[in-house]
Structure formats: C-alpha cells, structure tokens
A protein has these predicted regions:
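Bacterial N-terminal signal peptides
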Residues: 6-16
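N-terminal pro-sequences and low-complexity stem/linker regions of secreted or lumenal proteins
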Residues: 21-358
Length: 358
C-alpha cells in the first residue's frame, strides 16, 4: 500500500469514528420576545395528560408541544421553584420560610434543628438578574399576594382560612424569586412580585415583561387546602384537578388574546408543574439520586405553547427545570448559564424542538 493512500485511508476511518462518537449538534433556540411560565402543583404526568381529568391541559398538549419526559428535581415544592430560576436547589429540601436558617425558632422553620440545614435565603444570581443585565424585564405574578413586594410567608382569605398554613391561599414556598437575597434586599426587585390584579392590568394594557412566572393560589394550582371552611373543590383530588385545569385554560386564553401574541415576535407559554405526586424520585439531567436535595422530583407534565412554533409535537427528550432555565437563557440571549443549566455533560440540553419557529 502506498504511503499517501494509507494515510488517506487512516484519515477516513478516523473521521468516520469521530462522526459516530460526536453527539448530535443541537440547533440554537430562536430568540424570544416573551416567555411566560405557569406553574401548577404536585401532579404526575399520567394524572394530567388525560382528557377526562384535565381537558384543557391535555388539549394544549395535543395541539402544541408536549415534553413527554420532563421531571422535577426534588420533593417537596420550594426547591423546584428555586431550581427553575437559579439552576440549583442550593441544599433546600423542605418548604420552610425563605429567611430560615439553622437553629431558627420561627414556626415556619420547622426543620431548622436538623443536621445539614441550609440557609433558605439564596446568595446566588437568578434569571431575573440575567435579564436585567441584558436590558430585558421580568415579573412574578402570584395570586393572593397581599401587596406588590410583600415579603410574607403566607396570606389567607378569612372566608376560608383558620389562620394556618393549610388554609393559606398564597404561599411563598411557591414563588422561587423570594428566596433570593437580591430580591429580599432590593425593594425595586421585590416590587416585581405582584398579585393577579396586576396581571389583569398588564394583560389589558399590553405592558408585558420579557419573562413572567405565573403561579395561581393553592386552590387554583392543584395543591389544595385542608380546613373546615375550605370549599370542597379546593380539597377533593379530582375536583382540584378540574379547577386547576380550568385556571390554566383561562390564563392561556387571556395571554393569547394580547397583541403581543398576535405579533411577529416569538412568544411562548410554558405550563409546567413543580413536582410529581407522592414520593416518586424519578429524575434526569444533573440530578444526584442519593443527594438529599437534588434527587429527582418525579415525572411531571410540561407543555410548550408558542405563537409561531410547532403544532402537535411530542418530544421524548429527557428534560427538567434546569433544561427549561437553559432554554430561556438561550432564547433571551443572556450571558452565562446558571448552576446546573450549564451541565450539558450531565444531560441538561435546551428544549429546542419545542421552541423552534415554523
């Protein structure tokens, strides 16, 4: 065999092996003008992707984009919201108050005497800060938050509440943003956390932020309440799913009625859940099964609804809230990737197929 021919053959073989070993190139997520994330609570994929149980959400999944293998990071709720915004659970694995520290005697810090208890105020950047640095805007809309920027653990309606956490309509454990020190310490950032009265006004006026986190109250997000004055549809499982499904359907319709949705700019509404029901530890993508706070929060529904994107798409790629964060960072063209959103070597990839533009 001639030397030149042998070298060429070796090069061809090497190239063939390299092409087989290289992972597929994932296309860049298109630039988005608006991404609104609606979060519901504590339901498994199979409970919701059933037209008989949740016709609105199941219908949206069939019509738009369905992430069929999407997972939470942990149980219970609080750390999943933090993970969505900051790329990590930061050691949180309970629903204690956002100011709780080890040894704190506050009733909202029930686990503070446990070994390894972490500061629930997170001293790390969040998605809102990335957006600010890029000249973009953000807001959190939380139903029954008593006032813009209110740094409270719970808020109740006297008509149904007995003053306990189990009857509170608003719960800070379902906000995420309030855990970050930069929100707690800066009134200008805290005032970006508002109630649904402001959501109504912003949708009517067309003054929409680049990113919005939208969380209904505990009757409307499928979490549920327990108490003598709590309506049956807020505590009975099937009725609770129907109520939350109706809330999601209404929110999506109202967002789709805005001029921004009908414009040339790209707009996405993501309907997701914080965690699955029960104690399922199913997870993916930079989770650590034996970790106390990042072990996987179960298989959950996640629907991506876009004004110019795919229709009738079921995407079986494994994703979680870190994947969604990475996708939003790319869609908004912000600098850097927060926490586990950077862990492509651990399976955290963008949700490109669900955000592509037709």
């Amino acid at each position: 065999m001639r030397p030149m021919f042998a070298l060429a053959l070796v090069a061809l073989v090497a190239a063939a092996f390299a092409s087989q070993a290289a992972p597929p190139v994932r296309r860049l997520v298109p630039r988005y003008a608006h991404i609104f994330v609606i979060v519901e609570e504590n339901k498994d994929y199979g409970q919701i992707l059933d037209p008989a149980a949740a016709p609105n959400i199941a219908g949206l999944a069939a019509k738009y984009g369905n992430a069929t293998q999407f997972f939470g990071e942990v149980h219970p709720s609080e750390a999943n919201y933090v993970a969505l915004l900051g790329g990590d659970t930061f050691g949180i694995h309970d629903d204690d108050g956002f100011t709780c520290k080890a040894g704190d005697a506050d009733p909202f810090c029930g686990g503070s005497s446990e070994p390894g208890y972490v500061d629930h105020t997170v001293h790390a950047p969040h998605l809102g800060m990335q957006l600010e640095a890029a000249g973009l805007t953000w807001k959190g809309y939380f139903e029954n938050l008593p006032a813009p920027g209110a740094l409270v653990f719970i808020a109740s309606d006297p008509a149904i509440s007995d003053g306990t956490r189990k009857t509170a309509l608003y719960a800070s454990k379902h906000t995420g943003f309030v855990n970050f020190a930069q929100v707690q310490a800066d009134p200008r950032r805290a005032e970006k956390l508002v109630g649904f009265d402001r959501l109504d006004r912003d949708l009517a006026d067309g003054r929409l932020p680049s990113f919005a986190l939208i969380v209904p109250n505990q009757c409307n997000e499928m979490h549920g309440l327990v108490g003598p004055k709590v309506p049956a549809e807020c505590s009975h499982k099937d009725a609770l799913i129907r109520r939350g499904d109706q809330e999601v359907g209404d929110l999506v319709k109202r967002i789709q009625a805005t001029p921004a949705w009908r414009s040339a700019g790209n707009f996405a509404i993501v309907v997701t859940f914080d965690e699955g029901a029960g104690g399922s530890r199913g997870g993916c993508c930079a989770v650590t099964p034996d970790a106390p706070s990042n072990f996987g929060g179960g298989h959950i529904p996640t629907i991506v609804i876009t004004n110019h994107g795919p229709r009738g798409l079921a995407d079986p790629t494994p994703y979680n809230h870190y994947s969604l964060l990475r996708t939003m960072e790319e869609a908004f063209r912000v600098k850097g990737r927060l926490g586990h959103a950077a862990d492509t070597d651990k399976g955290v990839v963008t949700m490109t197929p669900l955000f592509e533009v037709r």
